[in-house]
A protein has these predicted regions:
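Non-catalytic pre-domain segments flanking phosphatase-related domains
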Residues: 1-24
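Helical "lid/coupling" subdomains associated with nucleotide-phosphate turnover
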Residues: 3-5, 25, 39-42, 62-93, ...
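N-terminal basic/disordered segments at the start of proteins
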Residues: 19-48
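A short acidic Gly-Thr/Ser loop motif
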Residues: 28-34, 153-159, 219-222, 299-301
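Short coil-to-beta-strand
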Residues: 47-57, 171-176, 315
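Dinucleotide-binding Rossmann-like beta1-alpha1 core, especially the glycine-rich loop
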Residues: 98
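A short amphipathic beta-strand at an alpha->beta junction
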Residues: 293, 499-513
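C-terminal structured domains
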Residues: 491-494, 498-501
Length: 513
């Protein structure tokens, strides 16, 4: 008998032994525009942000004006370091990965600034080269989007990093002095001049043609602000920036509106608003140079890349979505092991399915993830469980999942609690008709399983669910026959109707999967 998807994943995980410890980790990012502290918990492969604070110190402005980090910008940075040291100690972070990028790298008094900053922080600060920054940024994208294939572009205040990623590797990389603050200084605020500088610099990147007609992964706070603005302008229903995807032509058109100041930016935070026209122009010219098929936003960047770089290859290969769901199940479900039984129980559910937005492997992966967290709303009022579980899935800091995947899981897990989708609170978020049917059928099968087993392990292995072309068959062993009742008959029938096939209930010997 061939191994199921779940069996293969469990086998791969067992061979790795214990994951790296999940003591709180901290990263301090000293950028050209802001200084940010992020504290993480969870496993090293799926770091969960537990604290995130930034201060807009604008060190790059000081460097552009005088060549040094001095004055009010320096004083604010040092005040921030004192506070962040106290916060890191409060969080229990023993090792703080502190690094600095373009502004500190380019400052005439870089060594002096770093020495004083290290005294205030109590930790060493690593000044990254431009090339290291590009590699770490690409690593951060791959931590959250393992299948990334294309160009990673990270726009900061002092520089623009580009890296080609493919097959979970960084192939080529370069750092260019095309950060927003640097460009505004070099071009004296003239967007036409700034555009010429960007075009000239990109023309020298010989390997850029290798990523033509691939995905462009955009990184950096100003580009994220631009993407958020685009989501608002188009009425996009899911307010999650990570893995937000946009048609390249549509984004290029929108960038033109921003760079020519033909659209309202009032909803953008004031500390980002002035930089948006320049950032939009850089993105527009970059898209002209590489002709991407799509734009994907990554919430992960250099900070996460620093953590990812410390992982051994065997841990990098672990699925970040499934690991995150396992950790969530341990925190929020009645039984963490029940989800694995449920994943095996539903293994034959999609044997004849033909998803439209997902490959068969991706559908199985989403099914596994859904099984792991299908009980996370158990302690909420029954009237609100469908809404709670849907909103949790839609907004959880998951990585390694597309927006279509989030919506699929949210709809499926809502049906696990409530047949009437009006009560799901999904605000019209839908998939294609075929994939929506799959989500409904999956959710109603989970509803059947939880009724059969009381959401606890030990029962499902004595039953079998099998979906054929014409019948959905539930077999219950004779030892567990007492578990049958009207609610099981009803929920089996409803699940079968969702698949468009007949419900069959049997008792006795279990067939092989």
């Amino acid at each position: 008998m061939s191994k199921s998807y779940i069996d293969k994943y469990a086998e791969a995980l067992s061979k790795l032994g214990t994951l790296p410890p999940d003591a709180p980790q901290g990263v301090l990012d000293i950028g050209s525009n802001s200084v940010r502290l992020v504290g993480y918990s969870g496993s090293a492969r799926t770091p969960l942000p537990i604290y995130n604070e930034r201060a807009f110190c604008r060190l790059g402005e000081s460097v552009s004006a005088s060549g040094k980090i001095e004055g009010a910008q320096r004083d604010l940075a040092f005040e921030t370091f004192r506070r962040f040291r106290a916060i890191a100690e409060q969080l229990g972070i023993r090792e703080l990965a502190a690094f600095a990028t373009a502004a500190v790298r380019d400052a005439d008094n870089s060594a002096e600034f770093v020495t004083e900053a290290e005294k205030l922080l109590g930790h060493k600060i690593r000044v990254l080269s431009g090339e290291e920054e590009a590699i770490y940024s690409a690593d951060g994208v791959m931590l959250g989007i393992p299948e990334a294939d294309g160009l990673v572009a990270d726009l900061g205040g002092g520089s623009l990093e580009l890296a080609e990623v493919r097959n979970n590797e960084v192939r080529h990389w370069v750092s260019l002095p095309l950060g927003v603050l640097a460009l505004e200084e070099a071009g004296n605020g003239d967007l036409a001049r700034i555009g010429q500088l960007v075009e000239k610099a990109l023309a020298k990147v010989a390997w850029l043609s290798r990523v033509n007609e691939k995905t462009l992964y955009i990184v950096g706070g100003t580009w994220r602000a631009l993407a958020k603005l685009h989501m608002e302008a188009t009425g996009y229903p899911l307010e999650v920036l990570h893995q937000y995807e946009c048609d390249a032509y549509e984004m290029q058109r929108y960038c033109r509106l921003i760079s020519t100041k033909q659209t309202d930016l009032v909803s953008v935070a004031s500390n980002r608003r002035d930089a948006l026209p320049t950032a939009a122009l850089v993105l527009e010219i970059l898209m002209q140079a590489m002709q991407p098929t799509a734009i994907t936003v990554s919430a992960n960047a250099v900070r996460e890349g620093v953590l990812y770089a410390e992982l051994k290859n065997k841990y990098r290969r672990l699925d970040p979505l499934l690991l995150a769901c396992e950790e969530m199940a341990e925190r929020m479900c009645k039984s963490a092991s029940y989800g694995h039984e449920l994943a095996v129980w539903t293994d034959a559910l999609y044997k004849h399915a033909k998803p439209e937005a997902f490959s068969s492997d991706e559908l199985n992966r989403l099914r596994h993830a859904g099984c792991l967290i299908s009980d996370l709303a158990w302690d909420n009022h029954p009237s609100f469980r469908a809404q709670v579980i849907a909103q949790t899935v839609l907004t959880a800091p998951f990585v390694g999942i597309s927006h279509e995947g989030r919506i699929f899981l949210a709809r499926a897990l809502s049906f696990r609690h409530e047949v009437n989708e009006v009560k799901h609170g999904l605000n019209g978020m839908r998939l294609s008709q075929a994939d929506d049917r799959l989500a409904r059928a999956f959710g109603l099968s989970l509803r059947l399983a939880h009724s059969l087993s009381a959401s606890l392990p030990g029962v499902l292995p004595h039953t079998r669910l099998k979906a054929g072309r014409e019948k959905l068959t539930l077999t219950i062993s004779k030892e567990q026959q007492a578990l049958n009742g009207p609610i099981i008959d009803k929920r089996l029938r409803v699940a079968a109707e969702a698949m468009g096939i007949e419900a069959v209930l049997k008792f006795g010997r279990l067939d092989e999967r």
